[in-house]
């Protein structure tokens, strides 16, 4: 990928991100200037990486040149330093920028410290194009470095993070609410389907029972009340017979032999009561 194409990709990404977060900034009450400041900081960091040439490089380079010239004018205008005593010397060094080591003067100016100047790709020189190296008899040190320093206000970052968190929480609440509603609808739908199935099963059982009662397989002999075997003659304390009370699914007859499929019944055998869910019975009447 060529430098021009790479630069264009970076610029598209920066503009896209800024446009996407603009609405969030407005909702959070953050003005447009803050967004532009963050955009400029991002562009400045990209310029410092020197991965390619960007369209905004000149903007930051002009600002850095003005800062270097102002600092140079301030140092040259320091009281007690005779500018006519400066010696201009050309040196080939690997460091870019302006180097002002050991400015000495007879007046012993109490000035020392480090001055950080942000530079990118611009090399600051005097009018002759040479690096200034001045020596006098005083003790004043001024170190100029080319390391950039980017400061972002923590309160701006905190406000942005709070805005993003609020947006994410609102989205999560809406999603959870929608999921709960869908779950309730599914539960209600399942309950109705179960009720319909139970009704169909109950109706089928009723129809099956009615069909069995209407067939010839079940004769009047089962319903004959002439055999009052529930009443025991000569017994005052109750029946002494083996009794069974249950429902039947199917009854078939072959001559005098009966075969029954019984369910959900109670049976009394030798005066002991038992319950059962299903039973197969064969009986013969003589």
UniProtKB/Swiss-Prot annotation:
Disulfide pairings: none
InterPro entries to which the protein is assigned, alphabetical: TFIIA_asu/bsu (IPR004855), TFIIA_b-brl (IPR009088)
Protein's UniProt keywords contain Ribonucleoprotein: no
Predominant localisation class: cytoplasm
Cellular localization per UniProt: Cytoplasm; Nucleus
UniProt xrefs under Pfam families: TFIIA
Signal peptide: none
Keyword presence, Phosphoprotein: no
Acidic residues bias spans: 214-236
Biased composition (Basic and acidic residues): 175-195
Spans annotated as Disordered: 120-145, 167-195, 208-236
A GO molecular-function descriptor: transcription coregulator activity
Biological process, per Gene Ontology: positive regulation of transcription by RNA polymerase II; positive regulation of transcription initiation by RNA polymerase II; RNA polymerase II preinitiation complex assembly; transcription by RNA polymerase II; transcription initiation at RNA polymerase II promoter
Gene Ontology CC: one annotated term: nucleus
UniProt cross-references to Gene3D superfamilies, sorted A to Z: 1.10.287.100, Transcription factor IIA (TFIIA), beta-barrel domain (2.30.18.10)
Keywords: Cytoplasm, Nucleus, Transcription
Subunit and partners: TFIIA is a heterodimer composed of the large TOA1 and a small TOA2 subunits. Interacts with KAP122.
Family stated for the protein in its record: Belongs to the TFIIA subunit 1 family.
Its biological purpose: TFIIA is a component of the transcription machinery of RNA polymerase II and implicated in the regulation of basal transcription. Interacts with TBP (the TATA-binding protein).
Name of the protein in its database record: Transcription initiation factor IIA large subunit
Species in which this protein is naturally found: Saccharomyces cerevisiae (strain ATCC 204508 / S288c) (Baker's yeast)
